[in-house]
Swiss-Prot record:
A Pfam family assignment: FYVE_2
Biased composition (Basic and acidic residues): 184-193, 221-240
Domain commentary: The N-terminus of the RabBD domain is necessary and sufficient for interaction with RAB27A.
SUPFAM superfamilies documented for this protein: FYVE/PHD zinc finger (SSF57903)
Binding site for Zn(2+) 2: 112, 115, 138, 141
PANTHER family: RAB EFFECTOR NOC2, RABPHILIN, ISOFORM A
Source taxonomy: Eukaryota, Metazoa, Chordata, Craniata, Vertebrata
Tissue: Moderate to high levels of expression in thyroid, ovary, stomach, heart, pancreas, skeletal muscle, kidney and liver. Also detected in epithelial cells.
GO CC field: cytoplasm; presynapse; synapse; transport vesicle membrane
Biological source species: Homo sapiens (Human)
Chain segments carrying region Disordered: 170-315
Residue ranges of every copy of the RabBD domain listed in the record: 41-158
One of the record's GO molecular function terms: small GTPase binding
Full protein name: Rab effector Noc2
Polar residues composition bias: residue spans: 262-275
Length: 315
């Protein structure tokens, strides 16, 4: 008995006691075929580069298959989520999927066993047709059962790891896709001259409606004025610019043209003493020159004589 326990026999193998096992563990030796191997024998057991490459290829192939499986499960989950987002009814008075009205005046309805919602017969699937009492499922619950069956979630009691497919822009089946808003192009700033002309034209249209009578009365005087170099009384803006495209607003006259020309001629005769000389800035607006009388050179005819005083002009 003792020989059997302590291993005195040559051919019998006896399990050593704990003390010997602890000692051999500290010495890094054990009861195996590799116990007395030399360093040379251990070096021969190293893997060659070809063997390492083959092992790495197997591991990489397993990883690729795992990624493909996760993508496959992700497509199933994405399809299920899309069906859940596209529901159109409330599941009570309307079909949960298509939104069709249910009841006496509408389509016949069935009751889903899993989600407890009402659907029409077109959107429902009969799960157990052979039984006396048929079992109905909506398409969403039927798809969910299919996902659990094809992904192995029924075995793991939950969905395994999956990878959702990437949403590419412009997909027709993506209801939440919206194109990015394009930024409006910046408008080129208008020049100061163009804006000034437009503002003047708008004011011109407004003023032309109210001052039509004044424009008509002053049109005869304006035709007699020279085209260039004539300015108004204040001298800040010309009557016509050199380009001829822009005109300053016209000032209306309260007195008739004939009466005004007479007043101006009287004032001119009072200042200069004679009516033959023109003012330094040219002829005044509204003043008409006539040929002098043959007998008296340099003097205006009697018809152009002004009234005695300026009070008659103001009256």
């Amino acid at each position: 008995m003792a020989d059997t326990i302590f291993g005195s026999g040559n051919d019998q193998w006896v399990c050593p006691n704990d003390r010997q096992l602890a000692l051999r563990a500290k010495l890094q030796t054990g009861w195996s075929v590799h116990t007395y191997q030399t360093e040379k024998q251990r070096r021969k057991q190293h893997l060659s580069p070809a063997e390492v490459e083959a092992i790495l290829q197997v591991i990489q192939r397993a990883e690729r298959l795992d990624v493909l499986e996760q993508q496959r499960i992700g497509r199933l989950v994405e399809r299920l989520e899309t069906m859940r987002r596209n529901v159109m009814g409330n599941g009570l008075s309307q079909c949960l999927l298509c939104g069709e009205v249910l009841g006496f005046l509408g389509s016949s309805s069935v009751f889903c066993k899993d989600c407890r919602k009402k659907v029409c017969t077109k959107c429902g699937i009969e799960a157990s047709p052979g039984q006396k009492r048929p079992l109905w499922l909506c398409k969403i619950c039927s798809e969910q059962r299919e996902v659990w069956k094809r992904s192995g979630a029924w075995f793991y009691k939950g969905l395994p790891k999956y990878i959702l497919p990437l949403k590419t822009p412009g997909r027709a089946d993506d209801p939440h896709f919206r194109p990015l808003p394009t930024e409006p192009a910046e408008r080129e700033p208008r020049s100061s001259e163009t804006s000034r002309i437009y503002t003047w034209a708008r004011g011109r249209v407004v003023s032309s409606d109210s001052d039509s009578d004044s424009d008509l009365s002053s049109s005869s005087l304006e035709d007699r004025l020279p085209s260039t170099g004539v300015r108004d009384r204040k001298g800040d803006k010309p009557w016509k610019e050199s380009g001829g495209s822009v005109e300053a607003p016209r000032m209306g006259f309260t007195h008739p043209p004939g009466h005004l020309s007479g007043c101006q001629s009287s004032l001119a005769s009072g200042e200069t003493g004679t009516g033959s000389a023109d003012p330094p800035g040219g002829p005044r607006p509204g003043l008409t020159r006539r040929a002098p009388v043959k007998d008296t050179p340099g003097r205006a005819p009697a018809a152009d004589a002004a009234p005695a005083g300026p009070s008659s002009c103001l009256g």
